[in-house]
Curated annotation (Swiss-Prot):
UniProt keyword annotation of Oxidoreductase present: no
Gene Ontology MF: a single term: structural constituent of ribosome
GO cellular component: cytoplasm; ribonucleoprotein complex; ribosome
Any GO BP annotation: translation
InterPro entries (alphabetical): Ribosomal_bL33, Ribosomal_bL33_sf, Ribosomal_zn-bd
Name of this chain's protein: Large ribosomal subunit protein bL33B
Disulfide linkage: none
Swiss-Prot/TrEMBL keywords: Ribonucleoprotein, Ribosomal protein
Originating organism: Exiguobacterium sibiricum (strain DSM 17290 / CCUG 55495 / CIP 109462 / JCM 13490 / 255-15)
UniProt record similarity statement: Belongs to the bacterial ribosomal protein bL33 family.
UniProt keyword Transmembrane helix, yes or no: no
């Protein structure tokens, strides 16, 4: 089952990105390096509830 998740920046806390993931294949929290427009650089974004 695919569910919508929100990705929050670890440096500023901004929630800029929304994506989907399969909870059966990836039960742990998703971490991706994404672009943060406020800082103008790539930062680590983590899945939040």
């Amino acid at each position: 089952m695919r569910v919508k998740i929100t990705l929050a920046c670890t440096e500023t806390g901004d929630r800029t990105y929304i994506t989907k993931k399969n909870k059966r294949n990836n039960p742990e929290r998703l971490e991706l390096k994404k672009y943060n427009p406020r800082l103008r650089k790539h930062t680590l974004h983590r899945e939040v509830k």
